[in-house]
From Swiss-Prot:
GO cellular component terms attached to this protein's record: cytoplasm
Lineage, top ranks: Bacteria, Pseudomonadati, Campylobacterota, Epsilonproteobacteria, Campylobacterales
Catalytic activity from the UniProt record: 2 Fe(2+) + H2O2 + 2 H(+) = 2 Fe(3+) + 2 H2O
Keyword Nucleotide-binding belongs to the record: no
Complex and partners: Homododecamer. The 12 subunits form a hollow sphere into which the mineral iron core of up to 500 Fe(3+) can be deposited.
Protein name: DNA protection during starvation protein
Molecular functions (GO terms): ferric iron binding; oxidoreductase activity, acting on metal ions
Record carries keyword Aminoacyl-tRNA synthetase: no
Alphabetical keyword list: Cytoplasm, Iron, Iron storage, Metal-binding, Oxidoreductase, Virulence
């Protein structure tokens, strides 16, 4: 797979995760509602930024980003969430799994971009990996 193709898959994942985490944000229940509501807001805002950054990089490489939800659904590798009631522990377990998926995808992006001589995408992918690995560590500590 080429760099721009991986970027498109990641862009699809980012928009699906944006919606998925909104679902968690709106539908969490329990005594820790306020903390989880705030935490999930920060997370979905991060996915909005990621979606935009990926789209812009795709354009910079001379390709067209995803512009419809139907395109995103076809390309995503993330499982949508259709339930509408959640407890915080379940939310954070699901987000942790999604972060691990993204970590794998950004490693693939970094390696592929490196082979193609695309240093800018390598830097972007590695920056995302650093953020994801910190988030994974924090969620694992929270769930321990």
């Amino acid at each position: 797979m080429k760099t721009f193709e991986i970027l498109k898959h990641l862009q699809a994942d980012a928009i699906v995760l944006f919606m998925k985490v909104h679902n968690f944000h709106w539908n969490v229940k329990g005594t820790d509602f306020f903390n989880v509501h705030k935490a999930t807001e920060e997370i979905y805002e991060g996915f909005a930024d990621m979606f935009d950054d990926l789209a812009e990089r795709i354009v910079q490489l001379g390709h067209h980003p995803l512009v419809t939800l139907s395109e995103a659904i076809k390309l995503t590798r993330v499982k949508e969430e259709t339930k509408t009631s959640f407890h915080s522990k379940d939310i954070f377990k699901e987000i942790l799994e999604d972060y691990k998926h993204l970590e794998k995808e950004f490693k693939e992006l970094s390696n592929t971009a490196e082979k193609e001589g695309d240093k800018v995408t390598v830097t972007y992918a590695d920056d995302q990996l650093a953020k994801l690995q910190k988030s994974i560590w924090m969620l694992e500590a929270h769930l321990a």
